[in-house]
């Protein structure tokens, strides 16, 4: 059942903040003509007091998929993650990539690529809206816990090179508990760092938003790094961006041993 109230003091502040953050994420994509996660105005439900099947609080924020005609998101009582625009934008982007790529093989490289897109678009949502003073492309700096850094991944024990320090190799038996599903979060920095590299090379936030969103539409469920590189080069052309960014991307991908 849905509960309503005319009393503005009847709602918990954390729940209201989570609601507000999802509005901001929705508006971020709507500014590009993409309404909701499916691009066609699918209604959104933010479930507060996010729990697992045993009724225990989930110490995370989450995109739970499309259920009964709703895009479902979870906001927990045991953290402040859903009060941070970049974290909420991250989760919202999971819905966008799931719809755009007709699913995603969420493990190994393709899963890490999925996570990178969420970090990138979540940060762009936060920075373009003026909801942070961060210029180092941190993830979660306003949630009470910094998850990752796109400018200095190794500061948070993430790799900057395929097969390098902190890199988690792919696995035939992906498990969220044992190997992070083949490093979907651990290795997300490999692609996510490219957004910061482009930013330092002079690409504006508005140009980044167009670049990355267009490239999402070119991905497949089992995409690899070479395919993402090709999609980004194509996106530079599609969006009429300075051709020198293709050289920046190619140099950065090669430095990371991704092509």
Regions flagged by a language model, labelled:
Residues 1-189, 194-197, 251:
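Extracellular zinc-dependent metalloprotease catalytic-domain scaffold
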Residues 212-216:
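Long, well-ordered core segments of solenoidal/helical folds
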Residues 201, 217-222:
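Hydrolase catalytic cores
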């Amino acid at each position: 059942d849905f509960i309503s109230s005319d009393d503005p003091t009847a709602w918990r502040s954390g729940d209201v903040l989570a609601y507000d953050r999802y509005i901001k994420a929705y508006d971020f994509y709507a500014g590009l003509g993409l309404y909701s996660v499916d691009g066609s105005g699918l209604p959104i439900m933010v479930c507060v007091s996010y729990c697992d099947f045993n009724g225990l609080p989930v110490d995370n924020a989450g995109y739970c998929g499309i259920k009964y005609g709703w895009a479902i998101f979870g906001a927990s009582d045991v953290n402040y993650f859903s009060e941070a625009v970049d974290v909420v934008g991250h989760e919202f982007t999971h819905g966008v990539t799931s719809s755009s790529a007709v699913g995603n093989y969420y493990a190994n490289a393709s899963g890490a690529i999925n996570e990178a897109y969420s970090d990138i678009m979540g940060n762009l949502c936060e920075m373009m809206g003026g909801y942070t003073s961060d210029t180092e492309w941190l993830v979660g700096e306003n949630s009470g816990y910094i998850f990752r850094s796109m400018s200095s991944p190794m500061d948070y024990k993430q790799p900057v090179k395929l097969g390098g320090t902190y890199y988690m190799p792919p696995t035939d038996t992906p498990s969220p508990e044992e190997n992070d599903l083949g490093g979907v979060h651990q290795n997300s920095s490999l692609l996510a760092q490219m957004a910061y590299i482009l930013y330092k090379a002079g690409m504006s936030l508005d140009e980044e938003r167009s670049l990355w969103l267009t490239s999402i539409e070119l991905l497949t469920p089992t995409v690899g790094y070479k395919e993402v590189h090709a999609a980004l080069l194509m996106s530079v052309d599609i969006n009429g961006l300075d051709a020198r960014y293709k050289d920046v991307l190619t140099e950065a991908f090669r430095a990371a041993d991704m092509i």
